[in-house]
A protein has these predicted regions:
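Beta1-alpha1 glycine-rich phosphate/pyrophosphate-binding loop at the start
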Residues: 12, 16-101, 204-205, 270-275
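FAD-binding beta-loop-beta segment adjacent to the flavin cofactor pocket
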Residues: 51-60, 151-154, 294, 299, ...
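Short beta-strand to alpha-helix junction loop
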Residues: 74-93, 251-258, 285-297
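Rossmann-like dinucleotide-binding core of oxidoreductases
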Residues: 11, 16-32, 36-45, 130, ...
């Protein structure tokens, strides 16, 4: 039976794990709704991936305005695609302005989250404990760097580090740099070091389709214009429409997809050496992997005399460099592992335990999945932000977050009305997964190996239009939910401090 209110009932609380953009968006929503919450952050500052990644040449890979909180616009981006430090500075500035810091416990990594007695119980790496009614996992999926299992890696005599842990104490000039990896970070680091005159060797196993883009500075008039009455909202609507229509080629074959493929081939035509061009030409179609963005003309950079592209697998690390699978050796002073992240980890390595002692590791042992990117059966009152099947590539980040958070808030209130904790049913989750599986054929994300794919070859991102994502999350269907007893105090309705919707400023 649902719990009944009592004099000793604990106040309704939410714990958010992660103080990146998603966690902070959720914080503002809860704050306005009058719901008590605490954010646990393993690092010493907000920002998430923008705090962690500081490597040379890092620019946002989508338009700067796609990383704005809708309730706190920034009219003064320096460029169309802002440098990473500017994104991070905006997040910090907004967090201070909005008063979020008072809710955050920094240097507090949650290592265990367990649902028991109708509530979530948390333990930090320091041994501290906490209890809350709702658990929001806002950890993201680009937080656990992958270091390749290459023999001899620890024997290298010089500095070596992952791109997400870039060591800025290492002098850039006068070093022979080795960049292992050809994804977004590998491309941006290579071109940044190349134009500084460094000796750079990039080791790639697979070529990428690379977007050579222009990144102009924002003019004073553009900044002034956004401040005119009604102009910002108009420009945002135009931007969302442009993104949604412009990304339609990802969802189905047709002339738009053919035109995009042709455009990217023209970028490659800038490489004049036939042998180098062959190394840099992918053997799969455009969009199957995430498309690296080049702000400093990668194809021009790799044709500089100080840059070398080596195609193949690194077989061994030696104290003075690397050895390839074909036996060739390359002497290096510094190695950067631009080898990406464990994108299927999500909130792990945290141990998360739901009903009947079942852990997230057991549930995700064979396949990574969720209900609509926000919930999992068997884990009452645990909600994910940008979980499996989230709209990573075809919905603007603020829009996707508002849609997810809107659904989560409705689910929380539905549970509180019944004195219960809620989770999606197994049937609703399987129905959702069937819809996702049916939609993937014909999209660009099938047909090659990429980090979007689960163990059965199904991509775990949103394969439909933006409006369908909004429609899915716009209404709460109680028949899709399981209600389980919550602890005393979980009943009632929050008294809003401000407008309940975070984007209504």
């Amino acid at each position: 039976m649902p719990a009944s209110p009592s004099a000793s009932a604990s106040p309704f609380r939410v714990v958010i794990v992660g103080a990146g953009i998603s966690g902070l968006y959720m914080a503002e929503t809860l704050k306005r709704a009058g719901i008590d919450f605490t954010i646990y952050e393993k690092a010493d500052e907000v920002g998430g991936t923008w705090r962690e990644n500081t490597y040379p040449g890092l620019f946002v890979d989508v338009l700067s305005r796609q990383y704005e909180f809708l309730f706190d616009p920034n009219y003064d981006w320096s460029r169309k695609y802002a440098p990473a430090a500017e994104i991070q500075a905006y997040i910090v500035r907004t967090a201070k302005k909005r008063g979020w810091y008072q809710y955050i416990r920094f240097n507090s990594e949650i290592v265990d989250a367990r649902f028991s007695g109708g509530a979530w119980h948390f333990k930090t790496a320091k041994g501290e404990t906490d209890t809350a009614d709702v658990f929001i996992a806002a950890t993201g999926f680009l937080h656990k760097p992958i270091m390749p299992n290459i023999p001899g890696r620890e024997s290298f005599a010089g500095p070596s580090f992952h791109s997400a842990r870039f060591d800025h104490s290492v002098p850039v000039k006068g070093k022979r740099w080795g960049i292992i990896g050809s994804g977004c970070s590998g491309i941006q680091i290579t071109e940044a070091l190349a134009w500084q005159g460094c000796e750079v060797t990039q080791f790639i196993r697979r070529a990428q389709w690379i977007h050579i883009r222009e990144n102009p500075r924002t003019t004073l008039w553009e900044r002034i214009k956004l401040r005119l009455p009604g102009m910002y909202k108009r420009k945002q609507r135009e931007l969302w429409d442009f993104i949604i229509k412009g990304d339609a080629w990802r969802l189905k074959p047709g002339p738009q997809r053919d035109a995009m493929q042709a455009e990217f081939r023209t970028y490659l035509d800038a490489v004049k050496d036939p042998e180098l061009k062959k190394k840099l030409t992918p053997d799969y179609h455009l969009g199957c992997t995430r498309i690296p963005k080049s702000d400093q003309n990668y194809y021009a950079a790799v044709q500089l005399p100080n840059v070398h592209i080596v195609k193949g697998s690194v077989a061994r690390i030696h104290p003075d460099g690397v050895e390839m699978a074909d036996g060739t050796r390359h002497k290096l002073d510094v190695i950067v592992y631009a080898t990406g992240f464990d994108t299927h980890a999500y909130m792990r390595p945290m141990t998360v335990t739901g009903l009947n002692g079942v852990t997230i590791d057991e549930v995700w042992k064979d396949d990574i999945y969720s209900f609509a990117g926000v919930g999992l059966p068997g884990f009452p009152n645990m909600f994910l932000l940008y979980g499996p099947f989230a709209p990573l590539n075809n919905v603007p980040v603020p829009v996707g977050l508002e849609q997810e958070i809107g659904y989560i808030m409705k689910a929380i209130e539905a549970g509180r009305a019944k004195g219960a904790a809620v989770a999606p049913t197994a049937a609703a989750t399987e129905k959702f997964r069937e819809r996702m599986r049916a939609a993937f054929p014909g999209t660009v994300w099938v047909g090659c190996k990429n980090w979007y794919i689960d163990s059965k070859g199904t991509p775990i991102l949103w394969p439909l239009r933006q409006d369908e994502h909004g429609k899915l999350l716009a209404e709460l269907h109680e028949e899709d939910l399981e209600f389980v007893p919550a602890r005393a105090g979980a009943q009632g309705k929050a008294e809003p401090r401000e407008a309940a919707r975070a984007g209504s400023a």
